[in-house]
């Protein structure tokens, strides 16, 4: 490494104190010394001078950015004459590589150097070519980085207000290489182990294995030093994130660093100065000629790059130099050797015209440099002076990119454009989409949208320069001669272009086979063309004068633009057979007048040449606009001009098609009117466009000139060819709606795609079922459904009014009695109920009539059900508005036949959900379509409804608990009466024989239980009221009828069915119907008020008592004592907290049920929470079951001795406490009065004895005995005793074992080897 560095030459920042200038800079000396110390090992100076802050590997080579580098003497100086005093120099460290004479010469040369001005964003890049900007300097060149204090606000605003198409610093994670695209996500540890991309650097994030991997090549500290100098990234560099999207553009750039192998790890940031020995003029010539390159040569290079990508999957997509170096080391060396010559060989025609254009470009650049220098010295505004070179450089690079796009899309022989153009357009579309995705993810990094942020003064200057150059060019003569010469050049260049085009049409396998031969041919051609080009340059310089070259260049640009336009029109005409199917128009529209729906069958296209609509031109224009703008090297003026040209071409294309489209629209509308009326015709189709005829005509009239690429409006006109129909595959941006109905094969199907399986047709439609139905309701069936519902409501209102008049005319004997009852009931109401009745009177007539109509419908249904039972018919309900109620008999009442409920909406009839495989979204179909009923059934409104229901349920629970607390206070008054009787009975029992009374009570309880069960089986004593919410389902009628009697009741007596008619929008109503099934006598043996502790909760209904009703926004909730209620459904038993259902025990005064016993109530549901009172008329004096005994009472009955002892102990303790208090008081008095000890002793003898001597249950000895007895029986004591016994047993066993062993050994030792069992050793 050190030898290499010695050969290359070290460059370091002047960090020592003796090299500093007199005045200090903004960069502190400590930071400068730190960076210089780190730069010794990493050659950071050369890196900072020749690299950029963002990754320069994005463009395929190490772009250099000379930070105010001193040009050679041959170049014109573009710097001010005043050196900034705070600027610092960077000198080459030559103490160990140069002699003192060379150092002295270098110092003298440094004193004579011109001073670099305060650098702007784009002043840096004006020496470099637009794409490959390698500044070739001498090894001993001085690099000066001026550091200027941005004190003036005008200078500081340059970086703020300047909005050019340059990319910002990119410090994100590096994008994946093509080898890693299809692999799984790798952890940082596996990346380090497998690829070794990163290397730790203590001062920066510089160390990356590959040049293209590096995201920010210098540390934050070093970047702050550079930003302190107002240094910015050049215009044409791209961030790392856009590598994949900009590959086609990157691959065309020549890489000047190809002849240097990729250094390992952190060495990739080093720059070899030995390679930069050529002069700046030769570098500019080669870069200019490469940027004005031949389109055929670039096509050839593109095909070569495709060949290398096909043959080797290991190419690196991050640099174009590595793309072509993967074929082999020898081939890579040849390519590197010829790659620099390749740029000079690329010219539009291989003859004199290219030499002239090169010379013209050089002279125009020199002239612009001089003009810019003049302007910068004249104009004092630093914004304009810094803007000028950037405008000129961006103008040059935009010209080159324009020609490159031109050469990519343009070709003289248009007969060969057929399949090649289509494939190239597809590839450009995919690349543009990929880049747009990258930009959308990582922010707007490329100039995909136009930003015109130039100041007026700068724009005026640009326009003046353009006008001046235009006048100079137009004055030059001999334009006709150059035209003829240009035509000859075009004719000579045609055969070579044909040869290159034939090479591009090879397949992938053939390319792999003949790749070595093509490589050799290319190398030979490159050498041959290089020699020819040098000769042509010399001849062109001698032949043409400066004026002729200028005029010829101007004419050549015009001719290229004309050829470009002609090529685009040719591509449009040749691409019509491959036009996008989304822009084809449907054929054979069918109108169903019942819903006003146009159903157009869309099938596969039989004739590919049927695309005569301007959709292809629109797509091509949009893709062309995106591909040209994304090149991001266009200047502002060229962007505006480009957009205007494309918009003008598209508008011209649309004008030619407008007359035919209007004629086809009128003919299709006439055909639609001829379709006969009838039921909704179902057409088998993979897609169905449904819209109103008015909306389709509007979409036809208003066609946007340039629609968005993914929101193309499908115009509802038929194709001119009869057998061709089209797809419409994406959601249209206009008012038209893509829907799908039940797929039924029909004879109208014209192709095989129409008679696909129904499951396959479902998936051909991109919309979900909920979206389809929502769009259908918005367009088709809402108005007709609403009209049908309103018509049915009107007929029902008329029928109910006639029925009401009929009932009022009938008089019965019990009419006066019922009036008296209702008057007394309303007189007992709370004033809040009067207010509610007043509110009901003030409601509109529609709500009143709707409530009347619904209640009357339920009445008629109830009358039909009651005819089958033995009970008398229920009376007419009491209306809260004050309608007279009469009791009627079915024999005397001719009930008019009820009308059928309205049929469900048409979209429910059309849908056959069994055939559909997509998931159907659950719908809530409301009964009437008032208040936008169709829109309330979409997915969003369904979610909102669920959220609203949850909030109302929670609020309802809170309010219910609060109301229950208030009601419990009212019930306490009724409970106290019954509790007093129980207390009296219990006291009498306590005074007498407690045990016998308890035994008698248990016997009575055991005798009463089977008796009550027999009563419940034979003669049920309860009438249970269950609430069951009947919601209208989507498949059935919107109005649920009450079930038959006893369908969901446990005891099969009565059931109240609450039916929510419409719970959305307007105020809806709940119809509560009591269906009586049996009438039997009730004999209640026990009475008393009920409590809420048993499973059967009861309510007390007295003559004037009332139950509270808490109204939520969707349903009425009766508030009882119980918080939960059981609602028996068909499957399970649910617990509802918001509806309390009570079972009421009634009296048995009458053998037959009176008409007053069954009173139908109308519960009104309002959209907001309102509490009001509803009266329940009592049938007579009803008794309540007796309350179950409390735990204390049950303890008294079970263990009376324990209770007596407890009371005695409590009394003794209270007495002892009183005695202690009295003794304490007397003792205080004695102490306060006595003055001597004798008097104190005398008073103490007079004190009462202590409490424990006067009141005692047992003595101390008895207490100790009792305590010890209890302690001995404790489990801890017993366990300890057992433990001790076990230890004693083990100890004795061990002792016996030892004695036995000792005696046995002694016997054996004495010679007794046999042991008789009868002998006792122990």
Swiss-Prot record:
Keywords: Cytoplasm, Cytoskeleton. The keyword Cell cycle does not apply. Residues 78-111, 365-375, 394-408, 464-487, 495-512, 519-538 have a biased composition (Basic and acidic residues). It is found in: Cytoplasm, Cytoskeleton, Microtubule organizing center, Centrosome; Cytoplasm, Cytoskeleton, Microtubule organizing center, Centrosome, Centriole. Residues 1-26, 53-135, 165-193, 252-442, 464-614, 657-752, 814-844, 856-911, 1083-1109 are annotated as: Disordered. Residues 1115-1322 are annotated as: Interaction with Klp10A. Pfam families: ALMS_motif. Residues 1190-1309 are annotated as: ALMS motif. GO terms for biological process: male germ-line stem cell asymmetric division; positive regulation of centriole replication; positive regulation of centrosome duplication. Coiled coil: none annotated. Expressed in all germlines, including germline stem cells and spermatogonia. The keyword Nucleotide-binding does not apply. Disruption phenotype: RNAi-mediated knockdown in asymmetrically dividing male germline stem cells (GSCs), results in loss of centriole duplication and thereby leads to complete loss of centrosomes (and centrioles) from all male germ cells. In GSCs, results in the enrichment of both SAK and Sas-6 at the remaining elongated mother centrioles. Does not change Klp10A centrosome localization in male germline stem cells. RNAi-mediated knockdown in symmetrically dividing spermatogonia, does not affect normal centrosome duplication. Residues 354-364 have a biased composition (Acidic residues). Belongs to the ALMS1 family. Interacts (via C-terminus) with Klp10A. Interacts with SAK. This is Centrosome-associated protein Alms1a. It comes from Drosophila melanogaster. The lineage of its organism: Eukaryota, Metazoa, Ecdysozoa, Arthropoda, Hexapoda. The gene is Alms1a.
């Amino acid at each position: 490494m050190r030898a290499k560095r010695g050969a290359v030459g070290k460059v370091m920042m002047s960090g020592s104190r003796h090299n500093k200038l007199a005045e200090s800079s903004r960069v502190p000396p400590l930071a400068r010394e730190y960076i210089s110390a780190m730069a010794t090992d990493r050659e950071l100076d050369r890196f900072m001078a020749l690299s950029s802050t963002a990754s320069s590997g994005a463009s395929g080579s190490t772009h250099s950015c000379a930070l105010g580098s001193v040009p050679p003497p041959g170049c014109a100086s573009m710097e001010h004459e005043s050196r900034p005093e705070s600027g610092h120099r960077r000198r080459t460290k030559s103490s160990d590589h140069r002699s003192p004479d060379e150092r002295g010469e270098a110092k003298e040369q440094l004193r004579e150097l011109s001073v670099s001005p305060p650098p702007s964003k784009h002043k840096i890049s004006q020496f470099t070519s637009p794409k490959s900007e390698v500044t070739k300097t001498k090894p001993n060149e001085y690099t000066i980085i001026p550091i200027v204090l941005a004190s003036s606000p005008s200078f500081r605003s340059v970086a703020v207000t300047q909005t050019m198409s340059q990319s910002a610093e990119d410090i994100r994670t590096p994008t994946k290489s093509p080898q890693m695209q299809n692999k799984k996500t790798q952890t940082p540890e596996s990346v380090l182990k497998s690829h070794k991309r990163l290397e730790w650097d203590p001062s920066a994030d510089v160390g990356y294995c590959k040049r293209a991997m590096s995201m920010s090549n210098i540390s934050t500290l070093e970047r702050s030093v550079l930003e302190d100098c107002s240094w910015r990234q050049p215009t044409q560099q791209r961030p790392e994130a856009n590598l994949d999207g900009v590959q086609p553009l990157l691959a065309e750039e020549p890489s000047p660093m190809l002849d240097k192998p990729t250094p390992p790890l952190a060495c990739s940031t080093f720059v070899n100065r030995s390679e930069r020995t050529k002069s700046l003029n030769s570098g500019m010539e080669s870069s200019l000629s490469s940027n004005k390159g031949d389109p055929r040569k670039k096509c050839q290079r593109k095909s070569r790059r495709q060949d290398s990508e096909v043959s080797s999957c290991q190419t690196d997509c991050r640099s174009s130099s590595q793309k072509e170096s993967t074929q082999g080391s020898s081939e890579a060396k040849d390519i590197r050797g010829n790659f620099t010559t390749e740029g000079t060989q690329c010219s539009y025609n291989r003859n004199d015209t290219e030499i002239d254009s090169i010379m013209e470009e050089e002279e125009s650049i020199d002239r612009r440099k001089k003009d810019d220098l003049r302007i910068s010295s004249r104009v004092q505004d630093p914004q304009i002076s810094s803007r000028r070179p950037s405008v000129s450089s961006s103008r040059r690079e935009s010209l080159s990119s324009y020609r490159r796009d031109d050469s990519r899309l343009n070709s003289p022989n248009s007969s060969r454009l057929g399949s090649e153009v289509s494939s190239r357009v597809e590839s450009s579309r995919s690349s543009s989409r990929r880049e747009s995705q990258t930009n959308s993810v990582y922010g707007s990094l490329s100039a995909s949208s136009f930003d015109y942020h130039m100041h007026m003064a700068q724009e005026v200057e640009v326009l003046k320069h353009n006008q001046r150059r235009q006048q100079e060019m137009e004055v030059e003569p001999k334009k006709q001669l150059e035209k003829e010469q240009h035509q000859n050049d075009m004719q000579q260049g045609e055969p070579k272009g044909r040869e290159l085009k034939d090479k591009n049409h090879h397949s992938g396998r053939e390319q792999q086979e003949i790749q070595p031969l093509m490589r050799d041919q290319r190398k030979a051609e490159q050498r041959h063309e290089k020699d020819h080009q040098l000769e042509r340059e010399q001849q062109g310089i001698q032949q043409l004068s400066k004026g002729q070259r200028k005029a010829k260049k101007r004419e050549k640009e015009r001719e290229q633009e004309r050829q470009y336009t002609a090529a685009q029109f040719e591509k449009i005409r040749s691409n019509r057979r491959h036009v996008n199917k989304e822009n084809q128009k449907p054929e054979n529209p069918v109108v169903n007048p019942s819903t006003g729906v146009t159903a157009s069958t869309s099938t596969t296209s039989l004739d590919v040449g049927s695309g005569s609509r301007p959709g292809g031109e629109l797509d091509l224009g949009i893709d062309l606009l995106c591909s040209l703008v994304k090149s991001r090297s266009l200047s502002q003026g060229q962007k505006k001009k480009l957009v205007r040209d494309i918009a003008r071409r598209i508008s011209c294309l649309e004008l030619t098609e407008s007359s035919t489209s209007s004629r086809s629209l009128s003919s299709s509308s006439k055909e639609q009117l001829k379709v006969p009326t009838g039921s909704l015709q179902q057409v088998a189709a993979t897609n169905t466009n449904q819209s109103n005829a008015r909306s389709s005509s509007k979409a036809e009239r208003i066609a946007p000139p340039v629609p968005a690429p993914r929101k193309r409006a499908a115009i509802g006109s038929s194709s001119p060819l009869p057998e061709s129909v089209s797809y419409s595959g994406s959601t249209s941006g206009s008012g038209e709606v893509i829907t799908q109905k039940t797929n039924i094969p029909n004879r109208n199907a014209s192709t095989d795609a129409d008679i696909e399986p129904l499951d396959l047709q479902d998936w051909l439609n991109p919309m979900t079922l909920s979206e389809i139905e929502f769009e259908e309701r918005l367009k088709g069936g809402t108005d007709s459904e609403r009209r049908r519902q309103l018509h049915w409501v009107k007929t029902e209102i008329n029928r109910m009014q006639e029925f009401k008049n009929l009932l009022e005319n009938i008089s019965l004997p019990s009419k006066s009695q019922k009036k008296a009852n209702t008057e007394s009931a309303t007189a007992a109401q709370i004033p809040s109920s009067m207010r509610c009745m007043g509110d009901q009177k003030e409601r509109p007539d529609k709500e009143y009539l709707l409530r009347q109509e619904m209640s009357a419908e339920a009445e008629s249904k109830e009358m039909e059900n009651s005819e089958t039972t033995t009970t008398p018919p229920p009376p007419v309900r009491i209306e809260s508005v004050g309608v007279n109620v009469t009791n009627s008999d079915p024999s005397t009442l001719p009930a008019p036949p009820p009308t059928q409920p309205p049929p469900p909406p048409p979209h429910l009839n059309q849908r056959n959900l069994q055939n559909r495989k997509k998931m159907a979204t659950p719908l809530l179909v409301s009964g009437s379509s008032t208040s936008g009923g169709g829109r309330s059934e979409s997915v969003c409104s369904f979610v909102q409804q669920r959220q609203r229901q949850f909030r109302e349920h929670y609020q309802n629970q809170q309010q219910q608990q609060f109301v229950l607390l208030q009601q419990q206070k009212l019930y306490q008054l009724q409970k106290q009466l019954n509790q007093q009787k129980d207390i009296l009975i219990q006291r009498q029992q306590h005074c007498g024989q407690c045990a016998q009374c308890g035994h008698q009570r248990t016997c009575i309880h055991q005798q009463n239980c089977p008796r009550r069960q027999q009563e419940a089986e034979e003669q049920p004593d309860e009438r249970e009221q269950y609430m069951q919410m009947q919601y209208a389902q989507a498949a059935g009628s919107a109005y649920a009828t009450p079930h038959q009697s006893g369908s969901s009741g446990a005891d099969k007596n009565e059931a109240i069915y609450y039916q929510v008619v419409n719970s959305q929008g307007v105020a809806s109503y709940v119809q509560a119907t009591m269906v009586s099934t049996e009438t039997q006598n009730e004999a209640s043996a026990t009475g008393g008020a009920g409590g809420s502790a048993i499973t059967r909760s009861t309510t007390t209904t007295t003559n004037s008592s009332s139950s509270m009703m808490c109204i939520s926004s969707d349903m009425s909730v009766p508030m009882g004592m119980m918080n939960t209620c059981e609602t028996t459904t068909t499957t399970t038993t649910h617990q509802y907290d918001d509806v309390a259902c009570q079972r009421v025990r009634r009296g048995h005064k009458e053998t037959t049920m009176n008409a007053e016993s069954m009173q139908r109530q109308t519960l009104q549901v309002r959209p907001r929470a309102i509490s009001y009172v509803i009266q329940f008329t009592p049938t007579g004096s009803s008794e309540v079951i007796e309350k179950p005994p409390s735990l204390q009472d049950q303890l008294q009955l079970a263990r009376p001795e324990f209770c007596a002892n407890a009371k005695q102990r409590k009394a003794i303790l209270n007495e002892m406490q009183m005695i202690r208090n009295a003794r304490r008081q007397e003792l205080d008095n004695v102490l306060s009065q006595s003055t001597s000890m004798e008097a104190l002793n005398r008073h103490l003898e007079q004190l009462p004895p202590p409490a424990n001597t006067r009141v005692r249950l047992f003595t101390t000895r008895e207490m100790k005995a009792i305590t010890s007895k209890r302690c001995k029986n404790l489990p801890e004591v017993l366990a300890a005793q057992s433990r001790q016994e076990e230890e004693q047993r083990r100890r004795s066993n061990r002792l016996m074992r030892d004695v036995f062993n000792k005696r046995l050994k002694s016997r054996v030792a004495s010679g007794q080897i046999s042991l008789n069992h009868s002998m006792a050793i122990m």
